Amino acid sequence: MCESELEMSSESESQTKEDESESEEESTEEESTESEEVREAKEAVLEKYKNLGMITGVRNYLNMRKGPSTDYEICGVIFKNCAVEILEEKDGWMKIESGGATGYVSAEYVTTGEKARKLALSSMKYMAEILTDSVDALYEPKEGAEVITTFLKGERYDINGETKDWVEIEAVTELSGYVKRETVYTGYFLDEAIYFSLDGVSETRQDLIRKAFEYYGGTYVWGGKQLTAEGGVDCSGYTMCLYKLFGVQLPEFSGAQAEVGMTVDEDTIRPGDLIFYVGRYPGVIGHVAIYIGNGKIIHAASESKGICVSSWKYGPPVIMKNVMGD
């Protein structure tokens, strides 16, 4: 087994197969109830792939590496039901392209052929992609409304609602923002790999980032402080519990955590540093996330998203902190 996967017992492997079987049944049912317009839109997405693969059989994530063995450096991560373009296969490894990055993964965890196509169709998400260099997300769907944050070109967000002129998208944790329809493309997308580089980053910070990904997909619970399947965490509970594993003591709340450590900026921030954001109330810190590199963060985002990866500028950063003491 590739060292990049979390260890799975035979019981959990069996469960994975059951999950995949259920997924296929759900896919068939969904396809039969979808409109012709939706089916055509989804099929158009698949046409972009010459040799489609879908990641399956992993509990949390799979590491992408710079070469075809576990001896090579990790260059990104890819999650269950993510789509990849298969470039070549040799000696149990596949060279893939996904999310704008190229790397190698164990072929054992890549589903191909008709199964991949069906899984892809059932896994697509209806989202909004930013078309212009920057777009202001507004509190209300009207010109001159207060700005929540600014989105950047190429970023994708869940859609909470649509009208003729406006698209409502999740802007900040549990808070929707409105953008003009002509500034976004709305359509179906497949999840892809997340690329980042840990070159020049200390072993401790690398271990912290890898540990953070072990909880990807975990449950968001307001006020939660348990990094377990039965428990759950909120944004500050996630950072507090995670950093404690590495000897860093953080307060319970994001506002208090922002008082810890040394301030950094966009030029000096490193994977493992914390980024703090405004929450529901303008001017008040209400959210914290872990910077993982390449403009991405991992955080306990909301009840609907759980622990996930986002653009680091999904909301306006208030302050960035090095709490590692290095």
Question: Predicted segments — roles?
Answer:
Residues 1-51, 85, 98-126, 170-206:
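Boundary regions of SH3-family modules and the immediately adjacent low-complexity/disordered segments
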Residues 2-13, 22, 41, 47, ...:
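Beta-loop motif signature
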Residues 53-63, 125-137, 240-255, 291-293:
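Short, basic/aromatic beta-hairpin or loop at an interaction surface
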Residues 68-72, 145, 202-206, 229-234, ...:
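Soluble non-cytosolic domains of exported or imported proteins
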Residues 91-95, 164-168, 295-296:
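Short aromatic-glycine-enriched beta-strand elements
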Residues 194-200, 220-229, 278:
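Second-shell loop/turn segments in exported
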Residues 219-271, 318:
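Catalytic cysteine-centered active-site loop
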Residues 248-309, 313, 326:
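...with weaker cross-activation on analogous glycine-rich loops/strands in unrelated enzymes
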